[in-house]
């Protein structure tokens, strides 16, 4: 009876890793669409919101994993590895969001291939 209280009762870490990876893919696809449609102001705003939404969902998963990690005695793999993995995954989502925000902040436009090739280095 006492031993059962030590076993993890909630949270499947691997399922949460998969959910987080799905949010990263969503953010990456939205960022890709943002870059491809950057000249369209309405689409740019829409895709920026999609990137932000996916990143915020990833943050919620990260916080949930860390909360469960601190309340679970037995974990399927080393708790430091779980902590490092989910935080590195969250860094990826953060960097995608940072890239989208930087493009908006500096009003970076989509240069044509010819402009990129002909510009001085």
Please report, for each region that a protein language model flagged, where it lies by residue.
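Cytosolic, long alpha-helical scaffolding segments
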Residues: 1-119
């Amino acid at each position: 009876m006492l031993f059962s209280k030590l076993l993890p009762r909630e949270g499947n870490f691997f399922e949460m890793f998969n959910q987080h990876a799905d949010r990263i893919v969503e953010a990456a696809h939205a960022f890709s669409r943002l870059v491809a449609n950057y000249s369209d102001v309405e689409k740019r705003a829409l895709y920026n919101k999609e990137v932000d939404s996916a990143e915020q969902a990833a943050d919620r998963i990260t916080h949930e994993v860390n909360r469960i990690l601190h309340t679970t005695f037995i974990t399927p793999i080393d708790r430091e590895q779980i902590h490092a993995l989910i935080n590195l995954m969250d860094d990826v989502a953060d960097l995608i969001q940072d890239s989208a925000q930087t493009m908006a902040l500096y009003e970076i436009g989509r240069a044509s291939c010819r402009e990129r090739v002909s510009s001085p280095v």
